[in-house]
UniProtKB/Swiss-Prot annotation:
Name of protein: Probable tail spike protein
GO molecular function, one term: peptidase activity
The organism's taxonomic lineage, starting at the top: Viruses, Duplodnaviria, Heunggongvirae, Uroviricota, Caudoviricetes
Keyword Translocase: no
GO cellular component: virus tail, fiber
Lineage top rank: taxon: Viruses
Keyword Protease annotated: yes
Domain Peptidase S74: 653-779
UniProt keyword list: Degradation of host capsule during virus entry, Degradation of host cell envelope components during virus entry, Host-virus interaction, Hydrolase, Lyase, Protease, Viral attachment to host adhesion receptor, Viral attachment to host cell, Viral tail fiber protein, Viral tail protein, Virion, Virus entry into host cell
Residues that span the membrane, as ranges: none
Any one GO BP annotation for this protein: symbiont entry into host cell via disruption of host cell envelope
Annotated positions for site Cleavage: 653-654
Amino acid sequence: MINGLIQPKGSVSKETNKNSIALSLGLKFSEVEYLSTEILIDTYIVVFDPISEMVFYVGNAKGNPQTWNLNSDGNLILTTDFSTYTLLKIGLSNPDTSLKIGYQRKKINDSLSSIESVAGYMNSNFVSIMEFQHLITSKPNLNDMETWDWSPALDAAISYVQSYIPQTAVNSQMYGVMPIVFPPGVFQYSTEMKFTKYLNSTGSLSTCYTLIGSGMTSTVLQPITQGQNAFTATQCKINLINIGFRSGASYQTGAVLGSSTAWLPVVHSNWRCVGFSGFARGVVANLLFDSTFEDIFIQNISNMQSTSDVSYGFTFEVYTGPANGGTTGDGSGDDSNQITFIRPTIETSNADNAILFNASSINSTYPHHAINVFGGHIETHNLKAKCYNLKNCFNVNFYGTIFSQNGSAVDTNYRLGYIEACYNINFKNCRQVTTNRLTAYSSTDVKSIKITGNSKNIIFDNNHFINPYYSLNTYNKGPSYNIDSDTATVLDDSYLVINCTFNTYTNRNITSKISISNKNICNKNHILTVNDNGELVVSYTTSTDYSVTPTDILSFTNTGQIKTNGSIQLGIYNGTAGSKSIDFYSNGDKTTSMARILVDSSGRLYIRSFNGSQEWVFGSNAITPTTTSVYSIGSPSLTVNNLYVQNPVTVVSDENYKSNIQKIPDELLDAWENVEFNMWKMKAAINVKGITDARWHVGYIAQKIKSVLENAGLNWQDYGLITYESWIESEETYDQNGNVLSPYKAEGEIYMLRMEECLAVEMAYQRRKLDRIEKQLQK
């Protein structure tokens, strides 16, 4: 319609307005007139109705106008004094009208001389698909364009716009492409649309197509042939805005971008508010670079013709062709990359064998990479369909995306996501959930997410997961019941969970591992993990590729124990002299140090026990107690096995430390005459060495000395020769970690001798006896 190009009613004179109409239609001023009862209509080519502000072609009408009104098509029913006629409204979509009024769209390169006219202005406007409707031959219902087959119009429009204006850029000959606009409606077509580089273009710059609709549910393009692609695009850019595609037959694919076998990529394309509904494969990207998809909507994914073939929502396929400029089909070309999705919606799979978001490359040498998804949701509405599948990909990132595997309950679990041979895959602030609920757990169950192959650096950061064990307390809290990495080359090292929650939001957030490296060549790595015993383990490795299992070097148990396979160096980073200590708070009051190991600045080692009341000092040449004549080494029931010394034992024998000093009385020596020397084997030695190999020992027997003294009427307890201890039965005791502090001890008693005192009595007895013999000899 051109009424928008004329002057607004009443704003200018009739002559000015008539002149505007004449210029826009390429007519003479005298061939245009205002419609009234005072004109002879057959003397003009077009008339302007000031009531409707529309222009009409006079055609074969004759006579003086009497009455007129618009019909439902917007044409004018005119009655003259001669007859009644239908005057067609002037519209560029009607080629017959355009021809009759002397105007038809011209490409800008053919009409530069008239660019200052209204016709030139119209030539620079977007191309409407309605301009090509006259090419349509299949019109089952003439009055319903939604029944027409628009294939001829679509093909003609694409062919027409691709060379709209010649341009020279970067020493290349290219052609500017005029956007094609679609009004609201459903446009059926039986053959796929094909977009590719205009043949007469040279250089690397691509032909850039743009299709604009009135909204993805208002403007709908519908392929109607079984197995048909809605469109294919190769070696070009294609922009889609506010337009929808709806499957009109079985086994169809929405969009195919790039070739899978030849270097014919789609590049720098931008889609905004674009929908695909009902296709077996929504969008297939064979070779795609540097493109953005904003608010795309892919839904109602249907079955492939063979249900063994996978249906897809959006899929990045394997490229098997050569690199740019190559000829060998070896898959050596760069794969799809630099792709951005903003708020995508991919949902509702009517096919069980379906993947909503797929990226699979030929191998890890040529991976799909640099794919970023911001927000959106990927929702199956079918518990058997996968939300995502990634294979041979690098640097694929999801930010705030919801992955929801929902639908009618099933009695087993199906994969929500699958990752194979991928590197640097990041899920940041995502939600990965299933609505399926199982009543029991089995180690053979399929877990929601599978990581396999040589996958590394799969990061789940601040995600929330819901698995089928939502109601099973034992199995609803950790990643091991949600993520299966048993067949990954580096097992659990293939992925990292950071600050994630599982099932209920009230469960504690979980971080599975922390790895810290030096900043140079990163070959010195400390890794923090928690093992199945609840120990915090610090391990170390010089490997940068997980080829060597890290060595555990330090651990902290869940009861506070510290374990290490190395040394502890206290104060090594302190340049100021001073004591360093380890304190033990063991009585439970959290304030009193019950024992301490301390080293002073001179190197003396202090061991304090019993709240500091007992202390031993390891000096430069002696081990000493801090209080004299108080502490013992061993006890009657817990003796020291052997004591190895170079010099004889020195004991205190200072007169100043003794009282009631006197000679050994004869009654003791008289009794000692009956003390025997004996030889024996130790029972403990027999238990270890056997009766034959156990050695003989000689000396005194405590009980025999006791009997000798008692038989002589002496109280053995008046003398320090014999010691006696007894004890009651005591059970084994343990610390809080289950370690034995003291073993079980049966009830018992023991007699012991102070051997040097016994020998002193023996020598006194022998001396007295010698003295008596000498005196006898002297007589």
